[in-house]
Amino acid sequence: AQVMLMAVALVLMLAAVPRAAVAIDCGHVDSLVRPCLSYVQGGPGPSGQCCDGVKNLHNQARSQSDRQSACNCLKGIARGIHNLNEDNARSIPPKCGVNLPYTISLNIDCSRV
């Protein structure tokens, strides 16, 4: 009984310890912006799903570290897109009603976002 009480106390103590925030990972970023793929390849849009993903990403990337992680992920994703239309990619935030304090490009310095 005493061992069980100690185990319960340990679980409660661990549950009370604040966890470090997990940085935004590229798999998550990719899943959010994947609906934008046809538009950044020159198709019509951006779609409602694309805008929802961009808005969600913007809302989740609150800290500078999160913004830098998301930026680096987006650069990597963009480099892998065949027939990337950079003008369409740059137009997504304003067309989706997302105000970014920087311009999206393949050459963006993510340490400055």
Curated annotation (Swiss-Prot):
Superkingdom field: Eukaryota
Entry keyword set: Disulfide bond, Lipid-binding, Lipoprotein, Signal, Transport
One family name in Pfam for this protein: Tryp_alpha_amyl
GO BP annotations, alphabetical order: lipid transport
GO MF annotation terms: lipid binding
Signal peptide span: 1-24
Cysteine pairs bridged by disulfides in the record: C26-C73, C36-C50, C51-C96, C71-C110
Family matches, as InterPro entries: Bifun_inhib/LTP/seed_sf (IPR036312), Bifunc_inhib/LTP/seed_store (IPR016140), Plant_nsLTP (IPR000528)
Keyword Repeat set for record: no
Cis-14-hydroxy-10,13-dioxo-7-heptadecenoic acid aspartate ester lipid sites: D30
Main function: Plant non-specific lipid-transfer proteins transfer phospholipids as well as galactolipids across membranes. May play a role in wax or cutin deposition in the cell walls of expanding epidermal cells and certain secretory tissues.
PANTHER family: NON-SPECIFIC LIPID-TRANSFER PROTEIN 2-RELATED (PTHR33076)
Family to which this protein belongs: Belongs to the plant LTP family.
Protein name: Non-specific lipid-transfer protein
